[in-house]
Curated annotation (Swiss-Prot):
UniProt source species: Lactococcus lactis subsp. cremoris (strain SK11)
Alphabetical list of Pfam families matching this protein: UvrD-helicase, UvrD_C
Protein name as annotated: ATP-dependent helicase/nuclease subunit A
Assembly behavior: Heterodimer of AddA and AddB/RexB.
EC number: 3.1.-.-, 5.6.2.4
Family: Belongs to the helicase family. AddA subfamily.
GO CC terms in record: cytosol; DNA helicase complex
């Protein structure tokens, strides 16, 4: 094997030592390769691998690095000619599993467990990894603490009156949610510092102590104003010299009078004499802004100043930059009057937060369960307070290696300082890819070292890896052209010069000369909407954008590109559902890396939550009626109305059910035999469930409901059935997690879910088994570290998220708390009101300072997010956005005034831009970027839409699924249906027939028609759980149904073309089954299938095989004479020539081959249904039907069914 040729910089990064080293590794520069090779070189030099501390950002990255090291160490040993060196490499391989390679969280846990006695905790602590449990504990602590303060507990440090003022400053509408949000925000921020209590005590009020008036604000507050003033006067002077005023002489004296104030204004700003500045500026502002068209000066200045004047001065309704500054001054002069009161609120907030932090930590100690941040703080305390432990570790580790250093937090930085001996840090990262500010990572840590290490006198070393070995030149050049004009120190936190620019390193793979076919392509959907509607949407994406991308993706796939080589990157996962639905409509396989959204709002979960509420309290009418109306019991509007009129309007619906059952209501004659039987069946089941509430855990109750009512099977047959089933399983997992946390009782669980929904929170759903060759959909953040041949960036026009800049508190590490203060301006002379209060929410000085810092940091991070997204593409980048259709020139004239200031896009466009699309189009206008532009409309989309015929539409479940998703609308219908419908149905049998049936139900119904008195009722099939990652439900007994279900899932994903023990075992391991279930799947026996002729046929026709094919079919019941839908999923079929080979797996247990004929008879009707569906779908007459019997002794039996 030829040796990889290293660049000089890579070679330096691998071999340099004896000092702290910072490797600035651009995207695609091979940083993981460099780190792995450096470790191998250290081992060769005699450093044992367990003497290296290697920190990665994620567990996945740690796992991948271990695998890479195993491969590289083996390769190095094989190539080594030195026996001693080979021995070292062998020893490293042996110790690799024990090496300190992992996240900082994993290391701090290990350190804390080993030294638990130094921080007074139990060594058997557990991590509060489940958000639900930590939310529960935190909520309880918060509520108890608030209650204590409101009860006037004298032992506490805030009086009741002052505490009530504190709450009112952040909350409204008589609740404390606003205050609670503020407390949680501050707690989270403090937890990311190296010593939360110290920060809260010493830094939290620093801003209030520093910024008490306008004159305390930094030079940054006035520097832009000076620039804007100079620009303003320059415009006026140009107008006097070359403009309309010079030519016509109109208003020359008045203009000169304005210019006379120039020096006084500039001097007032320099001295921070804001009173003088305000008076002088407002006089100028009035001269320019006020007047009529007869005012010669005004008319002349309007012509000369045009848009630039508006930007600087503006009007009251739309103030310019200078007028905004004046407004800030006025605001500042007002807030100065209330600074003392605001400081008192801030001080009380500090006291409460400290008390909350300590109480919450004490509660976690009692539970012996901690958050990751707690463990990190314990670890820091252990190292700071115990020099012996600290020095032992420093002596033990020869080098401290940190991957993704740009995403390090201050807590992690403190850990590194404590572990390092001062000259053995090896840090790898890329400041341009620091995108985790929302997790409180601080890119400033990287930047500070980057600048200091670059100084000649600094003993430490900076190494730059600029070559990109991932992408084509077209992608790299476009990326460079964007960011060299976008980033600088002021905004972006760095200048994107030659040293930062990407350099193509894969010249042998991709040509240096640009090819226009690979130019990045900007797809703009021209939509019939206003600009406000477009820009006000932070993350909303239109169908047109997705369809435009889908058509391009379809073209790529048809040209031979594998779906797995294509990625769609989005700002937020909130659009995942829509993207998946549209891509599937184009027959494009798709994977949602972060799943579908709104788990708690999915209809199948909403129905189950109503059922739990009704079980907990049947007197809750809405949930009880929802339960009756749901597919589990199927009461229709007529039946519910008949029940409703059994009592007065104010009588509970549950009481009306009891009256109906006893025939003692107001209108007993309306409870016909059919409804009576239906009510009895419901009451029997409902009563049983209510009794079980105190006998079995909630998650087992849920599964009992799922299986007994066939509800799990039912939702699985609907559109997106696998995801619906995953949602139901997720609800069960959450219930189990809740109970394992020490909480018991259905009432508390329902209350918890209700609170989540009230606060618009969601819970994570369970992942389902995903197709391997599919287009990936993920957020920009999720894509970091990945690469794809073709990348689509969606929703470019969406606005940047500026919600954090509008919150009641904004925090900074240096200045602490910035908060808004609610003042009563009733006594102010300019305020006239008849109300007893004139409450106004104002920004305090620390808030203004923190807001400005946060805004710049947020825009800088947005630039880096865009950089990360661009650099995921190997071959081609697609940018997808949206514009309004009312614009001329395709809606792009907005950017005509975009200009460069030097090499950088003007501050006006960088600061005022609302999204990525603004930046890109502004630069396109100013610099002519190397990209294609394609503007398309809805009509063009429809015209160009492709027709796909690769597979018949088995999923004709849309109408029924929509009916299911809108099932809750029945409540309005009930209100309208108050008239008594006193009649018998002409088709009474139809009331007993479900409108939707599975093949199992059809089979059962077929049996029922043949039963004679005294015969045994047929047993229903087990419910199949398709495509699920099974969760651990404790030490319960594994049922035959679970084993059968898992076996079906395995058969679906097993690659029949590689039917061997190794391949099948690997597939089984990847599927994530519970270990107990996995051990019950007999792969050796399954492999005997491929010793048969039928098995060989399957392995030879994998490309013609369709597995897990859903279908729907309309049938007519012979007794009810009514139509109903049959839905199901057949395990698979093979289409060859003019016939179809249908097969279905059966896991029924049998020990004697004589039982096979009985099994064949049992499933004959079901297989005939599948056959009928395939005949209709493919218009094929010949369907050969086979049962693959997996439950027999020693081997798999294949049986053909007769027609």
């Amino acid at each position: 094997m030829s040796e990889v040729k290293l660049t000089p910089e890579q070679n330096e990064a691998i071999h340099s030592s004896g000092k702290n080293i910072l490797v600035s590794a651009s995207a695609g520069s091979g940083k993981t390769f460099v780190m792995a090779q450096r470790i191998v070189e250290k081992v060769k030099q005699g450093i044992e691998i367990d003497r290296l501390f290697i920190s990665t950002f994620t567990k996945k990255a740690a796992s991948e690095l271990r695998m890479r090291l195993e491969r590289d160490l083996k390769k190095a040993r094989q190539e080594s000619s030195d026996d001693e060196e080979a021995h070292r490499l062998t020893l490293a391989l042996h110790n690799l599993s024990n090496a300190d390679i992992g996240t900082m969280d994993s290391f701090t846990q290990k350190l804390t467990k080993a030294n638990f006695n130094r921080v007074n905790i139990d060594p058997n602590f557990r991590i509060l990894a489940d958000q639900t449990e930590s939310d529960l504990i935190r909520q309880e602590v918060f509520e108890q603490l608030v209650e204590s303060y409101l009860s006037a507990d004298e032992s506490l440090n805030i009086s009741k009156d002052k505490f009530e003022k504190l709450i009112k400053n952040f909350s409204k509408d008589r609740n404390i949610l606003g205050f609670q949000k503020v407390v949680y925000t501050i707690y989270r921020f403090a937890s990311a510092t190296e010593n939360p209590i110290s920060w809260l005590e010493n830094q939290f009020l620093k801003g209030f102590e520093t910024y008490k008036s306008l004159t305390d604000l930094s030079e940054d507050f006035t520097v832009n104003v000076k620039e804007n003033l100079l620009t303003f006067f320059e415009l006026l002077e140009n107008s006097l010299t070359n403009g309309v005023i010079a030519k016509k002489g109109a208003g020359r004296d008045k203009a000169n009078l304005i210019l006379d104030n120039k020096n006084e204004l500039l001097e007032a700003i320099s001295k921070k004499d804001f009173v003088t500045f305000t008076a002088l500026f407002l006089s100028i502002d009035t001269d320019i802004r006020v007047g009529s068209s007869k005012d010669e000066t005004l008319s002349a200045l309007k012509k000369d100043f045009s848009a630039q004047k508006q930007d600087l001065v503006g009007s009251k309704s739309k103030p310019g930059e200078l007028r905004k500054f004046v407004d800030k001054i006025k605001h500042g002069q007002l807030i100065e009057k209330y600074q003392k009161q605001a400081f008192e609120i801030a001080s009380d907030l500090q006291k409460f937060i400290i008390e909350f932090y300590k109480t919450y930590l004490e509660r976690k100690k009692n539970e012996n369960a901690f958050e990751y941040s707690d463990i990190a703080h314990f670890a820091i305390e252990i190292l700071e307070e115990n020099p012996d432990i600290r020095e032992n570790l420093r002596e033990h580790y020869d080098e401290i290696m940190i991957d993704e250093y740009q995403d390090t937090s201050h807590t992690q930085e403190r850990m590194l300082e404590l572990l390092s001996n001062g000259h053995n840090l090896f840090m790898v990262g890329d400041i341009k890819q620091s995108i985790y500010g929302f997790r409180l990572a601080d890119p400033g840590l990287f930047l500070e070292k980057y600048k200091s290490y670059d100084q000649a006198e600094n003993p430490n070393q900076l190494i730059r890896l600029k070559e990109n070995f991932r992408s084509r030149g077209e992608v790299l050049n476009f990326t460079n052209d964007i960011f060299k004009h976008l980033m600088d120190e002021k905004l972006g936190e760095m200048t994107y010069g030659k040293e930062k620019a990407l350099v193509q390193g894969n010249i042998s793979d991709y040509p240096v000369e640009a090819e226009k076919d690979f130019y990045p392509e900007l797809l703009l959907y021209k939509e019939n909407t206003s600009e406000e509607e477009i820009e006000d949407s932070e993350v909303k994406i239109s169908d047109g954008e997705i369809k435009g991308a889908a058509q391009e993706i379809k073209k790529l796939i048809e040209s031979g590109v594998e779906p797995k080589d294509i990625a769609i990157l989005v700002r937020s996962k909130s659009n995942n559902n829509k993207i998946e639905d549209i891509l599937l409509s184009y027959d494009i396989p798709v994977i949602l890396d972060e799943g579908r959204v709104d788990f708690l709002k999915s209809m199948e979960v909403l129905i189950m939550l109503d059922i739990l509420r009704a079980i907990d309290n049947p007197l809750y009418d809405l949930s009880l009626v929802a339960m009756l109306r749901s597919p589990l019991f199927g009461f229709n509007e007529d039946e519910l109305t008949r029940i409703s009129v059994q009592g007065s309007r104010d009588l509970r619906f549950w009481d009306k059910i009891l009256l109906s059952l006893k025939k003692e209501g107001k209108n007993p004659e309306l409870i016909n035999l059919s409804l009576e039987q239906k009510l009895k069946a419901f009451n029997q089941k409902f009563t049983e469930w209510r009794k079980l509430v105190n006998q079995i855990p909630i998650h087992r109750l849920l599964w009992k409901i799922y299986t007994e009512t066939y509800y799990f099977d039912y939702v699985g047959a609907l559109k997106n059935g696998e995801m619906r089933q995953a949602n139901l399983q997720a609800l069960s997992v959450r219930a189990e997690s809740y109970e394992s946390s020490g909480y018991k009782g259905l009432f508390k669980f329902v209350r918890l879910i209700n609170k989540f929904m009230e606060q618009n929170n969601d819970l994570a759903s369970v992942n389902i088994k995903l197709p391997q060759n599919a287009v990936r959909v993920m957020t920009f953040h999720k894509s970091k570290g990945l690469e794809f041949d073709y990348v689509f960036l969606m929703n470019l026009q969406s606005r940047f998220n500026d919600r954090d800049l509008k919150e009641d508190v904004i925090l900074s590490r240096e200045h602490g708390l910035g908060m808004k203060y609610i003042a009563d301006l009733k006594a102010e002379p300019d305020v006239i009101t008849d109300f007893p209060y004139a409450l106004v929410k104002m920004e305090t000085f620390p808030y203004m300072v923190n807001k400005d810092l946060k805004q710049r940091a947020a825009l800088s991070e947005e630039m880096r997010v865009l950089y990360v997204a661009f650099t995921r593409a190997k071959k081609k980048l697609y940018l997808v956005g949206k514009i309004k259709d009312t614009d001329k020139k395709a809606g792009l004239e907005l950017y005509d005034t975009a200009t460069l200031e030097g090499k950088i896009l003007s501050d006006k466009f960088r600061n005022s831009s609302r999204g990525f699309q603004h930046w890109i189009l502004a630069l396109q206008n100013a610099t002519k970027l190397p990209m294609k532009l394609n503007v398309y409309t809805k009509d063009e989309l429809e015209t160009e839409k492709l027709e796909f015929t690769s597979q018949p539409d088995f999923k004709k479940l849309v109408e029924e699924s929509e009916k299911f998703d809108n099932i809750m609308s029945f409540s309005d219908e009930i209100k309208e249906a108050q008239k008594i419908m006193n009649y018998q149905y002409p088709h009474q049998a139809a009331t007993e027939l479900s409108s939707i049936q599975t093949p199992s139900q059809v089979k059962k119904r077929s049996y029922e028609k043949q039963l004679q008195v005294g015969e045994v009722q047929p047993v229903s099939e087990f419910v199949r759980v398709k495509n699920l990652d099974f969760s651990d439900f404790g030490s319960k007994k594994i049922t035959a149904a679970e084993i059968g279900s898992a076996t079906h899932s395995f058969m679906q994903y097993a690659d029949f073309s590689q039917a061997d023990l190794f391949s099948f075992q690997a597939t089984l391991d990847e599927m994530g089954f519970d270990e107990k279930i996995k051990n019950q799947i007999d792969i050796t026996k399954i492999l005997t299938l491929f010793d048969t002729e039928f098995g060989k046929f399957l392995s030879e026709n994998v490309d013609k095989t369709v597995k897990e094919a859903p279908f729907s079919m309309l049938r007519t019941d012979e007794f009810a004479k009514e139509q109903y839908i049959v839905r199901g999923i057949c395990d698979g079929f093979v289409k060859i020539a003019d016939k179809i080979i249908l097969f279905d797996y059966k896991t029924d247990r049998f020990t004697n081959v004589s039982a096979i004929s009985e099994i064949k008879e049992r499933y004959k009707d079901q297989m005939n249904l599948y056959s009928e569906a395939l005949q209709k779908a493919y218009h094929v007459n010949q369907i050969d039907k086979y049962l693959i019997l997996l439950g027999g002794p020693r081997k798999v039996f294949v049986e053909k069914l007769d027609d």
